[in-house]
Every structure is written in structure tokens, then in C-alpha cells.
Curated annotation (Swiss-Prot):
PROSITE patterns: SAM_MT_UBIE (PS51608), UBIE_1 (PS01183), UBIE_2 (PS01184). It catalyses: a 2-demethylmenaquinol + S-adenosyl-L-methionine = a menaquinol + S-adenosyl-L-homocysteine + H(+); a 2-methoxy-6-(all-trans-polyprenyl)benzene-1,4-diol + S-adenosyl-L-methionine = a 5-methoxy-2-methyl-3-(all-trans-polyprenyl)benzene-1,4-diol + S-adenosyl-L-homocysteine + H(+). GO terms for biological process: aerobic respiration; menaquinone biosynthetic process; methylation. The keyword Transferase applies. Methyltransferase required for the conversion of demethylmenaquinol (DMKH2) to menaquinol (MKH2) and the conversion of 2-polyprenyl-6-methoxy-1,4-benzoquinol (DDMQH2) to 2-polyprenyl-3-methyl-6-methoxy-1,4-benzoquinol (DMQH2). S-adenosyl-L-methionine binds at residues 70, 91, 117-118. One of its GO terms (molecular function) is 2-methoxy-6-polyprenyl-1,4-benzoquinol methyltransferase activity. Pathway: Quinol/quinone metabolism; menaquinone biosynthesis; menaquinol from 1,4-dihydroxy-2-naphthoate: step 2/2; Cofactor biosynthesis; ubiquinone biosynthesis. This is Ubiquinone/menaquinone biosynthesis C-methyltransferase UbiE. It comes from the Bacteria. It is an enzyme of class 2 (transferase). Belongs to the class I-like SAM-binding methyltransferase superfamily. MenG/UbiE family. It comes from Laribacter hongkongensis (strain HLHK9).
Length: 244
């Protein structure tokens, strides 16, 4: 019997999810940054800045950015590791990766770039000081396997940062749901000419594990210590996992 998983609120075969997610991000890649600013009111920049500023990344470190998309975090990591460090920008989606690579090149920033599946990372054990994934984990079919891979490629003492939509503060939930399921698809239709992809976005956020569940998943994946910080009343959470 075929194994199933969630694609938003739909139940699909596991083998089909990656293709469906790929279609979403091929469709939205060119408008991704504009839509991020519109959907979050620019807050995504603050969330990412918090991630960068609390990571403790220093010159000479090796950093892997997974599902790095248009390169926001990779740019910030490169500025921090300097010429002696190493930052890899990776994504499973070629359209997103092309946008990110070209954007960084336009800024004069040359980074190694790779199409990579987070569930089968093409990197050796214990190679990176830090691994980051921002707004990408919820789209992965086997999150548990992806987290194990992230732990594998980290050096002992290394750190995983997961920045992801999470469970919002309960009193805000009615307003947040109205915004997510009415406003987001409408913005997607008007700006990106793609309401369906932004309907999936809203649904995928609701299906993603909450803060404590994700913490437990990271511990199960091999991280010795995990903590998290809620941002914007839990709209987003930053989880930090430490490989001991």
C-alpha cells in the first residue's frame, strides 16, 4: 500500500508531494521576495535578522543554508564568515536557486551553490559549524529524515537553526486564520497570478508541527539540546538545536 502524507490539507502519496511542492516554487520563484514583503509586512526581514544576529557565527566558520531560496540568509552568513569562511547556498528547487544565485552575483557575492535534497545531503559527516533552514522544513516530505541529515553534517558542538511558521498565540488565531485563508490567496492571485500556491502556503503552515512537537522531533533526530524563541506572538518560531 502506498504511503501517504500531507500536501497542505490534501492527502497525497509520498512520491507525489515533492513534485507538487516543486510546482509551487517553480511558479512563485520570480515573485517570491515581493510576496514575502507583502505577506509579512516586511516582518520576514526582522525574523531573519534575529536569526543571523543570535547565531554566533564568526569569521572562518562553515555554514550550510538549506532551502536557501533567494539567498537572504546565505548573504548574511557570508558577511559574517568572511573570506576565510565557507557558505553553501542549497535548495531542491532549481528556479528558486537560480533566482538566489543571480541575485547574489548581482551584489558581487560569489558562493558555492548546489541543488540538494535535505533528506539526502551531498556533504560529509561533521563538516559544518552551522546549518540553517528558513521557511523550508514544512515543505519536506520526511522531516524526521531531513533533521537527521542536518545533524549528521554538523560538527560536534555545531548548531542547527530552524526558522519556520508555527502555532500563533491562541487569542490571535481567528484573525490570523482570516488573513491566511482569505488575504494570502487574494494577494497571490493579484500579484503573482497564482492563488493556489498561496492557498497551499496557508495550509502547509497549519499542518506544520507546533513549537514543542518540532523540539521533540529535533531531539529524536540526535540533537542533544533544543530550545526555541517565539517571534511575533508565535507566527514564527526559531528553533536552535545543538549537536553535542
Amino acid at each position: 500500500m502506498d504511503k501517504t502524507t500531507h500536501f497542505g490539507f490534501k492527502t497525497v502519496n509520498e512520491d507525489d508531494k515533492a513534485g507538487r511542492v516543486a510546482e509551487v516554487f517553480h511558479s512563485v520563484a520570480k515573485k517570491y521576495d515581493v510576496m514575502n514583503d507583502l505577506m509579512s509586512g516586511g516582518l520576514h526581514r526582522i525574523w531573519k535578522h534575529f536569526t543571523l544576529s543570535t547565531a554566533g557565527v564568526r569569521p572562518g566558520m562553515k555554514v550550510l543554508d538549506i532551502a536557501g531560496g533567494t539567498g537572504d540568509l546565505a548573504r548574511g552568513w557570508k558577511k559574517r564568515v568572511g573570506k576565510t569562511g565557507e557558505v553553501w547556498l542549497t535548495d531542491i528547487n532549481s528556479s528558486m536557486l537560480t533566482v538566489g544565485r543571480d541575485r547574489l552575483l548581482d551584489e558581487g557575492m560569489i558562493l558555492p551553490v548546489a541543488i540538494a535534497d535535505a533528506e539526502k545531503l551531498p556533504f560529509p559527516d561533521s563538516h559544518f559549524d552551522l546549518v540553517s533552514v528558513a521557511f523550508g522544513l514544512r515543505n519536506m516530505t520526511h522531516k524526521d529524515q531531513a533533521l537527521k541529515e542536518m545533524c549528521r553534517v554538523l560538527k560536534p558542538g555545531g548548531k542547527l537553526l530552524v526558522l519556520e511558521f508555527s502555532k500563533v498565540w491562541t487569542p490571535l488565531k481567528p484573525v490570523y486564520d482570516l488573513y491566511s485563508f482569505k488575504a494570502l490567496p487574494l494577494m497571490g492571485k493579484l500579484v503573482a497570478r497564482d492563488a493556489d500556491s498561496y492557498q497551499y502556503l496557508a495550509e502547509s503552515i497549519r499542518m506544520h508541527p507546533d513549537q514543542d512537537t518540532l523540539k521533540d522531533m529535533m531531539l529524536e533526530a540526535g540533537f542533544g539540546k533544543v530550545d526555541y524563541h517565539n517571534l511575533s506572538a508565535g507566527v514564527v518560531a526559531l528553533h536552535k538545536g545543538y549537536k553535542l
